[in-house]
Amino acid sequence: MILKASSFKLPKPPLAYSLAACFLGLLAVASLPAQDTPDKNALPRDSQEKIDIDDVTRTYVVHLPPNYDQQQHYPVVILLHGRNQDAGDMARLTHFNQLADKDGIIAVYPNASHGQWNIGVRPEEPSPFAPRRGGGGRRGGWPGGGGGYPGGGGGGGYPGGGQSGGQNPEETKNRPEPPDDVAFLNQMLDQLALKYSLDTRRIYATGLSDGGFMALRVGCSMADRVAAIAAVGAAMPKTMICLPARAVPALFINGTDDPVVPDSGGNYKPGRFHVLSAEDSAKTWSKFDRCGEKPAQGKLPAVDKGGKETKTYTYSGCQDNAQVVLYSVKNAGNTWPGGEQYTSEKEVGKTSNALNANDAIWNFLVTRKIPGESGVQK
């Protein structure tokens, strides 16, 4: 006979048997290894934060290392994305979170306003940020298509917001003020310090292309808060006014075949200002830091098999034990060495795997500290 499921029932055991089984079950549970109880106060490892500045909401993304402990104190690396990119793009193309997880770093990815940083440089030509007759707004830029390179999407942007010679006063009269990104980053650090456990003597900034220019501005304007900087695919604008409050260690990583920020100097791709060569950029920063006159030259072996060596230029003997270093990456473009090829080689050049930018940057930054007694955020 086949029993239907609805009619098939186990007989009820005696009460004494039920109590014994329950007791044995409790013993078995008690003998199991203790399980970690989720901490209701634990912070999410990835979160988007907001901050209001001059009635404008700005955002940034925070990535915490595994097993983040509020009782410990962590170094912070600010990663500044390229033009027409955002925080998520920067995290994806650099893979920096992997290094942050391994070495216990809080990685912070700020979002620029409209995808472009105010790098504090007066444009040498009419700024596309100004309203123009016949319209015309921000064009192109990866990942949305069009221009494609983070250094400039073929139009749009405010390299510094100042009115330059040759502009029509009628066109600039009603120009909206560019955002104060130094104020944004300062308030971002204030907010971070309230929520997370930071070592405030070990805060660093790095960035790619337009973000690299912004990293240079951070070194110029936030030397009291940022211990050292690293600029990738960026160079010193000829018109940048830079007066660091102290000697700020700086690393430059430039590709020899960069079509956006020319390695030999010249016109920055969007056509708004000119840059020094990579070597002259490092030399200029070495003067800020009062380093020795001539750099020591060397070579780094390629990380990938068959890759080209990376030339190095190191300025030492600087004030406060600072250092200025240039890595000249053979055949690389306006890209993050060891990262993703985020758009076509025609637009930005090649991504080299001969150097791992994450390792090179962190090896340079890791020992740098703002001079002082203590940088631990209580």
Set out the residue ranges of the language-model regions.
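Conserved alpha/beta-hydrolase
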Residues: 104-114
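Conserved acidic catalytic loop of the alpha/beta-hydrolase fold
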Residues: 183-200
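Structural cue for short, hydrophobic secondary-structure segments
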Residues: 79-82, 109, 328
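Active-site glycine-rich loops that stabilize anionic/oxyanionic intermediates
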Residues: 82-85, 332
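Short beta-strand/loop motif that positions the catalytic acidic residue
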Residues: 252-254
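Bacterial N-terminal signal peptides
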Residues: 18-28
